[in-house]
């Protein structure tokens, strides 16, 4: 039995109710509303800094000079930005379309059907369909619903909570996760070499083939009657090693670069890749975990598929690798497990929320 409370707590329900103003708990504080405008106009803006695009086809070149140049471009993007559009990444347009169609078909189901997959954060069951992944002390809400589940490795998945409708959801999503895992290896090799390490080193440091976990969060941002007052996802950095993002070609991702919010372009057939806190820590700050946020709009539903590549929670101590530390560049981060890092961020965030605005 699906309770009416859970149905009514969904942003999709709220957005479809005909409201012209949003409830106060969705209105962000003034300091968070900087540079919120028409996201479609902002995406067209070609002035100022632009998120770099990396053509990964060159990484497979027979020519070592071409390979080295591509490695250098990727490293530069990781150092300067911590985010990039990957093109020719080896995942077919056909598979990406299948993933997008399957995710959209799930969110197109009646809310009552989606509620069968509802998570229960109070009891620690975070996988499934929900409307708020983390509590913040200010009690503010984000303009999104989501579906969260572990997608790789196979022995860590719980297919019983994956959507059974549409019929090809599991097959498409599982294959996409498998291919993303291969892409993660390819990228981690380049980033290892960029630090002067053996190419397999970073992958080993984040858990290797057995332990690196891929968690998918499908973000569903309904149309919002007052997009200038709300955020789909508030400003944050990812805790992951890497995050790969697919979207439905509706703009919404903004990055905080050189003191300003920059709107990412919608690059056809690309996958957006973020460097997360884990790699920032291991590289002693050489690779950046960039602050970013998700915007909403009045005209179009936005959907994004974020896959977080995360180290095991307790098995590995995250700290700057010895090779990245010197007398001139002392360690910038204390040793913590991945779980401790997450708790530290949540605690810091809750403390900041209690400060007077």
Swiss-Prot record:
Cofactor note: Binds 1 Fe cation per subunit.
Pfam families registered for this protein in UniProt: 2OG-FeII_Oxy, DIOX_N
Pathway named in the protein's UniProt entry: Pigment biosynthesis; anthocyanin biosynthesis
InterPro entries: DIOX_N, IPNS-like_FE2OG_OXY, IPNS-like_sf, Oxoglu/Fe-dep_dioxygenase_dom, Plant_2OG-oxidoreductases
Any one biological process term the GO annotation gives: anthocyanin-containing compound biosynthetic process
The enzyme's E.C. designation: 1.14.20.4
Binding site for Fe cation: 236, 238, 292
PROSITE patterns: FE2OG_OXY
Keywords: Dioxygenase, Flavonoid biosynthesis, Iron, Metal-binding, Oxidoreductase, Vitamin C
Annotated catalysed reactions: a (2R,3S,4S)-leucoanthocyanidin + 2-oxoglutarate + O2 = a 4-H-anthocyanidin with a 3-hydroxy group + succinate + CO2 + 2 H2O
Coiled coil: none
Occurrences of domain Fe2OG dioxygenase (ranges): 212-311
Cofactor dependency: Fe cation; L-ascorbate
Domain of life: Eukaryota
GO MF annotations, alphabetized: L-ascorbic acid binding; leucocyanidin oxygenase activity; metal ion binding
Keyword Nucleotide-binding: no
Family: Belongs to the iron/ascorbate-dependent oxidoreductase family.
Function as written in the Swiss-Prot or TrEMBL entry: Oxidation of leucoanthocyanidins into anthocyanidins.
Protein name: Leucoanthocyanidin dioxygenase
Organism: Malus domestica (Apple)
């Amino acid at each position: 039995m699906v309770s009416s409370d859970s149905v009514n707590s969904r942003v999709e329900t709220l957005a479809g109710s005909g409201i012209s103003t949003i409830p106060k708990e969705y209105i962000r504080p003034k300091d968070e509303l900087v540079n919120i405008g028409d996201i479609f106009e902002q995406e067209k803006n070609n002035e100022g800094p632009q998120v770099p695009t990396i053509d990964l086809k060159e990484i497979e070149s027979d020519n070592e000079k071409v390979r080295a140049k591509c490695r250098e471009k990727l490293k530069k993007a990781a150092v300067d930005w911590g985010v990039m559009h990957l093109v020719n990444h080896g995942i077919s347009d056909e598979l990406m379309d299948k993933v997008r169609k399957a995710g959209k078909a799930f969110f197109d189901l009646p809310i009552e059907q989606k509620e069968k997959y509802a998570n229960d954060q109070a009891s620690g069951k975070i996988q499934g369909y929900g409307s708020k992944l983390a509590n913040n002390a200010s009690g503010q809400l984000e303009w999104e619903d989501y579906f969260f589940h572990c997608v790789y490795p196979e022995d860590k998945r719980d297919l019983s909570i994956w959507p059974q409708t549409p019929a090809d959801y599991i097959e498409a999503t599982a294959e996409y996760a498998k291919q993303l895992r291969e892409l993660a290896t390819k990228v981690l090799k380049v980033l290892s070499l960029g630090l002067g390490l053996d190419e397999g080193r970073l992958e080993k440091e984040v858990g290797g083939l057995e332990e690196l976990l891929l968690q998918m969060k499908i973000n569903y941002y309904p149309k919002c009657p007052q997009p200038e007052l709300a955020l789909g996802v508030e400003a944050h950095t990812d805790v992951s090693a890497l995050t790969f993002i697919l979207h439905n070609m509706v703009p919404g991702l903004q990055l905080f670069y050189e003191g300003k919010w920059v709107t990412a372009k919608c690059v056809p057939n690309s996958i957006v890749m973020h460097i997360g806190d884990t790699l920032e820590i291991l590289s002693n700050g050489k690779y950046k975990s960039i602050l970013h946020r998700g915007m909403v709009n009045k005209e179009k539903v936005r959907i994004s598929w974020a896959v977080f590549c995360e180290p095991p929670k307790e098995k590995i101590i995250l700290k700057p690798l010895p090779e990245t530390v010197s007398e001139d560049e002392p360690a910038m981060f204390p040793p913590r497990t991945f779980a401790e890092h997450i708790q530290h961020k949540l605690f810091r965030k809750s403390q900041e929320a209690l400060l007077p605005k």
